[in-house]
Regions:
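FIC/Doc superfamily catalytic core
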Residues: 1-141
Length: 141
């Protein structure tokens, strides 16, 4: 029964004190096995993982197309009780890739912030510079 299974899953998850990435992955695998929706379970489940990572200050991750076959194999292995490590390793690989992308974006954002600050400073200096004839109120002849 889907409602009972979801209630049990949520109760178990919410009872945990210190959520780690393995707990989020475990929740995801169980959520996907319950399959609460007619369509979109995978997208919803991966979105929940992303949100839970952010909520618990864990670097989130996205399963890209290159990792999809490993993700599906890992999910199958996890849900059938064969092994949990394959899915966990796939998610950790995705997390490493996401971190690498973010680390490349942060310096670009800093550079953009520095440029914006420099432009604001230059603009402020330019508008207060009254030595230019057009700014001093004296007409240019």
């Amino acid at each position: 029964d889907v409602p009972k299974s979801m209630q049990q899953l949520l109760s178990e998850y919410l009872a945990k004190q210190d959520i780690k990435i393995e707990d989020i992955i475990d929740f995801h695998a169980k959520f996907e096995k319950i399959h609460p929706f007619q369509d979109g379970n995978g997208r919803v489940g991966r979105l929940i993982m992303f949100k839970e990572c952010l909520h618990h200050n864990i670097t989130p991750f996205i399963i890209d197309m290159n990792l999809q076959p490993y993700y599906y194999r890992g999910l199958w292995n996890y849900q059938t009780g064969q092994e949990k490590g394959y899915l966990v390793d796939t998610c950790l690989t995705a997390q490493d890739r996401y971190s690498a992308i973010c680390s490349r974006l942060v310096p670009k954002q800093r550079m953009a912030d520095q440029l914006a600050t420099a432009q604001e400073k230059a603009s402020a200096e330019h508008t207060t510079d009254r030595s230019h004839p057009e700014r001093s109120g004296n007409p240019v002849l």
